[in-house]
């Protein structure tokens, strides 16, 4: 007898929710802010989904200066350009990009809270 309600544990993919569709079938333009564990207490904050016409290098430079952390822009095949910052900067990044006028508050999805 097999119980189909039991979920089999699988590996966690932090980018699995990147393509979210609404009721009309079109994808919403969300900016996803996630955290990934590295080794030990070290973590990495990723910002994905910013508009392509924005200057990622200027945004990264301002983020690094405002948050006092190191970071880089990574070009991913599936996700496009992703900003990576050292440390848990989820709240700081979300408030920064709203105050800078890059995106609106309702366009941000903060994951892993």
UniProtKB/Swiss-Prot annotation:
Q: Which GO terms are recorded in the biological process aspect for this UniProt protein?
A: regulation of translation
Which InterPro entries does the UniProt entry name for this protein? SUI1, SUI1_dom_sf, SUI1_euk
Which PANTHER family does the entry link to? EUKARYOTIC TRANSLATION INITIATION FACTOR SUI1
Which purpose does this protein serve, as stated in its record?
Probably involved in translation.
> According to its UniProt record, what is one Pfam family this protein matches?
SUI1
Q: Which family does it belong to?
A: Belongs to the SUI1 family.
Organism's domain of life?
Eukaryota
One GO MF term attached to the UniProt entry: translation initiation factor activity
- The species this protein was found in: Spuriopimpinella brachycarpa
Recorded protein name is Protein translation factor SUI1 homolog
Give the matching SUPFAM superfamilies: eIF1-like
Q: Which UniProt keywords apply?
A: Protein biosynthesis, Translation regulation
């Amino acid at each position: 007898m097999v119980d189909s309600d039991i979920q089999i544990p699988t590996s966690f993919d932090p980018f699995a929710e990147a393509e979210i569709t609404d009721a009309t079938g079109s994808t919403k333009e969300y900016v996803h802010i996630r955290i990934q564990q590295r080794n030990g207490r070290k973590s990495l904050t990723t910002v994905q989904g910013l508009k392509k016409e924005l200057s990622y290098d200027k945004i990264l430079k301002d983020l690094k200066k405002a948050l006092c952390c190191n970071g880089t822009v990574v070009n991913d095949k599936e996700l496009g350009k992703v900003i990576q910052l050292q440390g848990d900067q989820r709240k700081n990044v979300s408030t920064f990009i709203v105050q800078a006028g890059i995106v609106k508050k309702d366009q941000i999805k903060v994951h892993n809270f």
